[in-house]
Amino acid sequence: MAEFDFAEEINSEYLEEEYLTDAMTGGQDKRRQLYYQLIQSMKKAESVDIIVSFLMEAGVKMILQELENTLKRGARIRILTGNYLGITQPSALYLIKRKLGDRVDLRFYSEKGRSFHPKSYIFHYTDHSEMYIGSSNISRSALTTGIEWNYRFSSKKDPENYERFFQTFEDLFENHSIIIDDKELKRYSRNWHRPAVTKDLDKYDIADQETEDTKIKPLYEPRGAQIEALYALEDTRAEGAKKALIHAATGIGKTYLAAFDSKPYKRVLFVAHREEILRQAAVSFRNVRNSEDYGFFTGDEKSTDKSVIFASVATLGKSEYLNEQYFAPDYFEYVVIDEFHHAVNNQYRKIVDYFHPQFLLGLTATPERMDGKNIYEICDYNVPYEISLKDGINKGMLVPFHYYGIYDDTDYTKLHVVKGKYVEKELNETYIGNVRRYDLIYKY
């Protein structure tokens, strides 16, 4: 599932000079929220330095666009954050790397023997600098409605104390930090488990979002593992890859991931084995693309002129449709194969072999097959990102659950076997007729 977020339109009255303040205390009055003051300072700054204990995904999303605007003006941005206890979310770091790349000097505080709890935002102008210092890390609630105390002062008014703070930042950044490059980010993400304290932080951010009273418009954005996977997919394409397999547990949001990743492409094909999946996928793509320009290629519908086509394997895999009369091999720029572990089957393979898109994405939660057939060769053994069920639970993206092993007394001995398989009609009747089986399922 994708995150349903909001694109915020800041009312210009809050940005007038008379509403600027040096003391920010949070709460519902936007004039007392740190976020609106930071945006004003960022719009004028020639360089920006940020030092905070942790970064949260929701907070980064709020300031990301203004950070990019600042970079476009030629400004320098440095960010120093902590990794202690794993409060900094990997997705927050991936957001920065994906959107801003190496234009931002992003680092972890590296000393393990000292605590790291600073929260300061420093803006440098032509003839002076100003510093915000207080209690706000980069989370949505801390930047807006949370009770956070922050104070702004200028290097002109208090040069001695400004210099003391700034030189401390310089020392920490240059001598007590490690650069967050791709290798370090992957290492941090791989080892990251969602700490209990972030459950409250996430709760505050969500509550703040739900009570938002600014002018808003609905927006679907990637979240969590989707952000990490998108970064990995963009990286693998930059290296020249034409195919990739994403192995992600059910519930991570693979369909939305495909919708986000394929958004820049004009003609997209989404293939699945059940029409129900196609209909659900269409909703995801419509939300992400904000477009009704999509159609279906199934037993009852044969759309060929839409930007996004959702096709059933059973229909598209027929020879009568895999030809120039319906679709040229290079018609689709981007092809998604859902349930990619089925791709070794005949009809799936016909589709995969026929089309030659700019990029092919396979999605699966279960890459291993009981028959030993290899699905990895179909995607050139390229798996840029994977997240298991266990990892999804540990990272707080999926809920934990309990397995129940329940004895099923269904009697298969009277069923006929043809070519190594039970007769499907008899099997269905046996299951449907076993009322005790239903009782067991409902009981547990």
Predicted segments, located by residue:
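Walker B catalytic acidic pair
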Residues: D338-E339
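Walker A/P-loop
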Residues: A238-D261
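Pre-Walker A adenine-sensing motif
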Residues: Q226-A238
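Conserved helix/coil segment N-terminal to the catalytic DExD/H
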Residues: G299-Y331, N345-K350
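Conserved helix-turn-beta segment of the N-terminal RecA-like "Helicase ATP-binding" lobe
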Residues: V268, E276-E301
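PLD/PLD-like phosphodiesterase catalytic module centered on the HKD motif
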Residues: M1-R223, I227
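Conserved interdomain linker/interface between the two RecA-like ATPase lobes of SF2 helicase motors
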Residues: V383-Y444
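Post-DEXD/H (motif II) to motif III coupling segment of the RecA-like Helicase ATP-binding lobe
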Residues: H342-Y403
